[in-house]
Amino acid sequence: MLPSGFLMLPGGVTLALTAMVGEHLFDKIGFKPLLLTSLILLTFILSLFTTISSETTTMTAAILYAAFTIGVGLSIGPVMTLALNQVPKPLHAHGSAISNTINQVAGAIGPALYTSIMTMASQHFIQQSNEANKTLLQIKSMTSGVHTVYYVAIAFAIVSFLLTLTLKKKDQQLETQ
């Protein structure tokens, strides 16, 4: 259990620090450039996660996770701020409550979805494999499942990137109406 804590610690610290930097950059350069940059970073780091295997060291995994949290930290605060800025000031309390609820629900659905995908991909690998060594089969099937999860996450990041390209500033939205 101790190595998993050490694996997550650098990412947690990195996330906390980059969330503060993300808010500052949001004020300085705006939402769209910041989110696009963070999504490019996230996509790149997620693609690196598709190379992990049973041979990957804990240090490598910790570095990858910390790099991943840089992208998350640069995007999560500005996304929440942008969402709340779309709500009229008298309704900010309700907007904040809804935002927090959505965050909690997504936080519950995400791991369940990815675990299901990983399990299905691992089972599919086992069904398609002719590996005789059971231990090696388990390792390979789990690795296949994990890689599949990261490919799905990459797809979500790419879709998010494309959707971000369609966002307009509030004053641009008013001009087009």
PLM feature spans:
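12-transmembrane solute porter fold
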Residues: 1-124, 144-167
